[in-house]
Amino acid sequence: MKITIISFTEQGMRLGQRVNELLNTMGHHVEMVDRMKNHRVPLKEFAGEYFYSNDALVFIGATGIAVRAIAPFLKDKFEDPAVLCMDELGNYVISLLSGHMGGANELSRILAEHLGANAVITTATDVEGVWAVDEWAKKNKLKLSDRKLAREVSSRLLDGESVEMVSGYKIIGKVPTYLRNSQSPISIYVTNRTFKKSTPEKSILRLIPKNICVGVGCKKDTGIEKMDEAFSAWLTKNQIDGAAIASFATIDLKANEPAILALAKKYKARLKIYTAKDLEKAKGDFNDSEFVEEITGVGNVCERASSLVYSERMSEKECFDGITFASTYNKDLTYAFF
């Protein structure tokens, strides 16, 4: 995590140095800011700069100062960074903002444990000792399909109700009884597919892993809009959630194709580039084309490219007016309950 520690007094700065050393040993990228030496810039302006560029802020000082500093920049818990507040003697570590999604609760516990302080966490699920779907999803790098429904899941569990959880991937440990109610009006699915949709009788919250590689091929200078429309159609046809796309893969001849670059950027996915010789080494049965081989030196780009990333085939080559897609996925994901 990228973390900034902000202190206001000499005592606070000394505590900040201890926190800095601890976080650095944990592999975080940490910056320390001493407001005694940076007082010319108004605090709100100063805090805003760090609020948007950090994963977490640690204020050492009064909670009121921290609240006033960050107030103008708050959006929601899915976008805001974690914000913690500590008193300058290090007695308390307060999880102030983005406890689950931002990781403030976990960071507060870690700092408190190592500094001999008390963690102050007020999130209902934590206080009641109830499983939190948003926190579990974040820890397992899963994206929530519906934020409102995630809140409803937590609300039901806090009220003592149970819901259903289904996973297309291996679960380590025993799934708690409160997640095994098949008669519940809410079900949680760990899936990269969109085929599970809510109905009036059943609400479906999908937890989406980022575990799909899409092989892509296209004609030279294919339009960006055309590529985007074709890919959206492909996602819909194959019932694949765009949030599950981890990477795109193609041949080096298409490495600088604007439409492919734009697609990878839109879906925040890596772009894997392979040579024709690389693609020839791919193992499996592929829908080869003599025409494609004449152009690229290999009979199939999209299927072969995706299979070099993940071995499990998800969809075969499909053509959308000169644009081809195929996909593979990582089936060996595991999720734990302890």
Where do the protein language model's features map onto the residues?
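Extreme N-terminal starter segment of soluble prokaryotic enzymes
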Residues: 1-5
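Glycine-rich Rossmann-fold phosphate-binding loop(s) that bind the pyrophosphate
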Residues: 8
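Conserved mixed alpha/beta catalytic, RNA-binding, or beta-rich assembly cores of soluble enzyme
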Residues: 12-28, 36-42, 49-56, 60-105, ...
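Short secondary-structure junctions
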Residues: 29-31, 177-178, 311-314
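Secondary-structure junction/capping motif
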Residues: 31-34, 38-46, 103-106, 289-291, ...
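General small-molecule cofactor/ligand-binding pocket signal
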Residues: 31-33, 120, 270-274
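C-terminal non-catalytic interaction/assembly regions of soluble proteins
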Residues: 232, 249-306, 310-313, 319-323
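Hydrophobic, glycine-enriched assembly/anchoring segments
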Residues: 322-332, 338
